[in-house]
């Protein structure tokens, strides 16, 4: 029953995250315009990081309210592989499809809600710049990189929640910017599926190969390396006193 509750929470938070994250570009452009930062090369990157920081902060609260809900199946798999998750293989198998359904619902909803003039400025249509094989390699590397950074920040990073959240936002934006030269990097199979569903490419081999197999591979390999570098402390069993 707890696995089903987790899956439902994941579906809800992924639905909401897709709607919000689809507008990051619009939010960044609006803020740049409002503060008069046109022509300043670093402004969009800094503002994007702040937008993501605020968004992650809000969704951390929402996730806690929903009982630890998550919008990234690769994250769930990585924490399980690293040995720091209460998930089982069964719960992971339930949560991942729920996140994909939530992402598809969010993508459909935002495309219906957004005014026509903004539709070309939102969304996340998967884009392979150099073919499926190169896209798969880049997605493995990007997923590996961002997963290791996330594990490092959350498990070995600063204790202050705001500091953790800011570093997560910085890592996410940095990896996304680097990866945009090769694919539209998702590092999140559920969200990739949601937008692929909009563009009718969700049931293709290239989509499954690049955005599911490769993303999971990168995340799991990263978690395995993290577990080797930072092994969990051994459990110390207390000796029972003799009566």
Swiss-Prot record:
It is found in: Endoplasmic reticulum membrane. A motif (NPA 1) lies at residues 72-74. Its main location: endoplasmic reticulum. It is a multi-pass membrane protein. GO terms for molecular function: water channel activity. GO terms for cellular component: endoplasmic reticulum; endoplasmic reticulum membrane. Water channel required to facilitate the transport of water across cell membrane. This is Probable aquaporin SIP1-2.
